[in-house]
């Protein structure tokens, strides 16, 4: 998959895959490939039959392409039913964004909060997924946010009169707690935090593991808000640190 069908690492992977198939004695290695691209003519020139090329529009940015045929690997790995649920969820959020009043419009409120922090000099935001199934979410959101809003000019090419995207970073659950949370609770930087958790775990052997994860997640948000005094300044938490907790069904 490559939007332009010229991406260096993608083409190198394709060449390696073809070589592997040929070494394995496959008579028609190109017939085992499927191309997903906004430049179908280049895929055909490469040697892939046009019936095995899945095109998508040039206007679809890479960071938004998951919901196009670029999502083929997800559909193959998770099943078409799961992929259709993903599409339905995206459509539901699109409708919410278009129809919900401003005071209850989640994307609008999130954008206003981001702008509020940026205009007050906050340069980073953190997101922590309290479920191993969401371990790649922070990396995905890094591309979604910083590639979308990381330029210093507007869509019309004019210099931006406000801060561009904040720097998004994060990690997974309790691993991050033992690595970076001291800075979030006690440091001099103000870092808005988003916690994402899942109501139901997938550990059928011992549900207590997931319960502990949720307790940790909720406790971190509460501690950021309330803080904790201590005689030893090194152990005190000032509180009044912003965070949002999102609990998925």
Regions found by a protein language model. Name each.
Residues 1-249:
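A SIS-like phosphosugar-recognition module
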């Amino acid at each position: 998959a490559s939007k332009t069908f010229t991406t260096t690492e993608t083409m190198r992977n394709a060449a390696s895959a073809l070589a592997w198939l040929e070494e394995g004695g496959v008579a028609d290695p190109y017939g085992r490939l499927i191309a997903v691209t906004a430049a179908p003519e280049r895929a055909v020139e490469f040697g892939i039959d046009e019936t095995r090329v899945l095109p998508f529009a040039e206007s679809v940015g890479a960071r938004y392409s998951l919901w196009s045929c670029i999502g083929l690997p997800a559909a193959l790995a998770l099943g078409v039913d799961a992929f259709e649920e993903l599409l339905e969820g995206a459509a539901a959020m699109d409708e919410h964004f278009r129809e919900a009043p401003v005071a209850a419009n989640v994307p609008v409120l999130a954008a206003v909060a981001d702008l509020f922090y940026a205009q007050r000099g906050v340069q980073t935001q953190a997101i922590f997924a309290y479920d191993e199934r969401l371990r790649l979410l922070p990396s995905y959101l890094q591309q979604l946010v910083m590639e979308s809003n990381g330029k210093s000019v507007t869509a019309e090419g004019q210099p931006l009169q406000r801060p561009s995207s904040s720097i998004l970073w994060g990690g997974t659950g309790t691993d991050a707690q033992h690595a970076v949370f001291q800075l979030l609770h006690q440091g001099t930087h103000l870092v808005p935090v988003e916690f994402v958790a899942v109501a139901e775990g997938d550990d059928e052997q011992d549900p207590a593991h997931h319960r502990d994860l949720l307790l940790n997640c909720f406790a971190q948000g509460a501690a950021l808000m309330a803080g904790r005094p201590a005689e030893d300044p090194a152990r005190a938490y000032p509180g009044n640190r912003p965070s949002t907790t999102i609990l998925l069904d």
